[in-house]
UniProtKB/Swiss-Prot annotation:
Matching SUPFAM superfamilies: Carbamate kinase-like (SSF53633)
Protein name: Carbamate kinase
Keyword Nucleotide-binding among record annotations: yes
GO biological process: arginine deiminase pathway
GO-annotated cellular components: cytosol
Superkingdom of source: Eukaryota
GO MF term set: ATP binding; carbamate kinase activity
Associated pathway: Metabolic intermediate metabolism; carbamoyl phosphate degradation; CO(2) and NH(3) from carbamoyl phosphate: step 1/1
Keyword list, A-Z: Arginine metabolism, ATP-binding, Kinase, Nucleotide-binding, Transferase
NCBIfam families: arcC (TIGR00746), PRK12352.1 (NF009007)
Cross-referenced InterPro entries: AceGlu_kinase-like_sf, Asp/Glu/Uridylate_kinase, Carb_kinase
Family statement drawn from the similarity comment of this UniProt entry: Belongs to the carbamate kinase family.
Subunit structure: Homodimer.
Length: 314
């Protein structure tokens, strides 16, 4: 079975970590010790990852570097840098996990660009949180002194927000499919892909300053690679109804129609669980195949139907 797995950027930079290379390497090693179980069980694996914390950190490093007369790079370049950095980590740590299990599989990462619509309303309405969490006082300083868009992120603190256009298709689609069909484990579409547009007048591709939601990007990837299932890994075993209320209930399986009803009822937090559910719905609707939401340490159990939220066609 071919599985596309979307790994959250926060899984590679956990809360409380300073964000050093060693921190992220340790988190990645822990994550790959779980991911390798999917391969060991006989499945084909395509993996994508978030990059919110990493992209935000690189962006802030660019801003700080300007004080030393080091030119800052555009946001889309920051995204490309995270694909290279996290691609290296994921390749090395998954390769190590495969070796430890005696599994002979090659892992390759691809810098991936995603076409977006230049008229996407997201460019006028930034919603995507990136970077570290700040206190209310720090957020007010960054908003007033630096002009950043800062919002509260699901009760966890304040973060910078940037445009998040809907991904259309990947520039490297055929290369990814060729590698997957040849038996490679492919790491691609990091952070949803580098957002690009086609300048029709110049007939060339250009990057744009935005961050694509990695889950929506992953759903496009899953459909493009003919995945048998699409899995989003987050920090909870199942999506929940009545989140943080006395009658909180885990969703074990639901149809597209049922999940759409839950969205209308406001059960999923914007910027947190909501985009994950929306990405799953997009995949299930376009392919007729199931999507899963679960925690990293429940991934294999979810594939076996023992844990997780499974979304199926009507």
């Amino acid at each position: 079975m071919r599985i596309v797995v979307a790994l959250g950027g926060n899984a590679l930079l956990q809360r409380g970590m300073k964000g050093t290379f060693q921190d992220q390497q340790a988190a990645c090693r822990l994550a790959m010790s779980q991911i390798v179980k999917i391969v060991k069980d006989g499945n084909e694996l395509v993996m994508t990852h978030g990059n919110g914390p990493q992209c935000g950190a690189i962006f802030l490093q660019n801003v700080a570097g300007e004080q030393e007369k080091v030119p800052a790079m555009p946001l889309h370049v920051c995204g490309a840098e995270t694909q290279g950095f996290l691609g290296e980590l994921l390749q090395q740590e998954l390769d190590g996990a495969l070796r430890a299990e005696g599994i002979k599989k090659n892992v390759v990462s691809i810098v991936t660009q995603s076409f977006v619509d230049p008229k996407d309303p997201a460019f006028q309405n930034p919603t995507k949180p990136i970077g570290p969490f700040y206190s209310k006082e720090e957020a007010e300083f960054l908003r007033n002194e630096r002009g950043y868009n800062m919002v509260e992120d699901a009760g966890r603190g304040y973060r910078m927000i940037v445009p998040s256009p809907v991904p259309q298709k990947f520039v490297e689609k055929e290369a990814i499919k060729t590698l997957v069909n040849s038996g490679f484990i492919v790491v691609c579409s990091g952070g949803g892909g580098i957002p690009v547009i086609l300048d029709e007048q110049e007939n060339r591709i250009e990057g744009v300053d935005a961050v694509i939601d990695k889950d929506l990007g992953a759903s496009v990837l899953a459909a493009a690679t003919n995945a048998d299932a699409f899995m989003i890994l987050t920090d909870v075993p199942e999506a929940l109804l009545n989140y943080r209320k006395e009658n909180e209930t885990a969703i074990r399986q639901a149809t597209v129609a049922e999940m759409e009803k839950y969205i209308e009822e406001g059960h999923f937090i914007k910027g947190s669980m909501l985009p994950k559910v929306q990405a799953c719905l997009r995949f299930v609707k376009s392919t007729g195949k199931p999507a899963l939401i679960t925690a990293l340490d429940c991934a294999l159990q979810a594939l076996k139907g023992e844990r997780g939220t499974k979304i199926v066609p009507n």
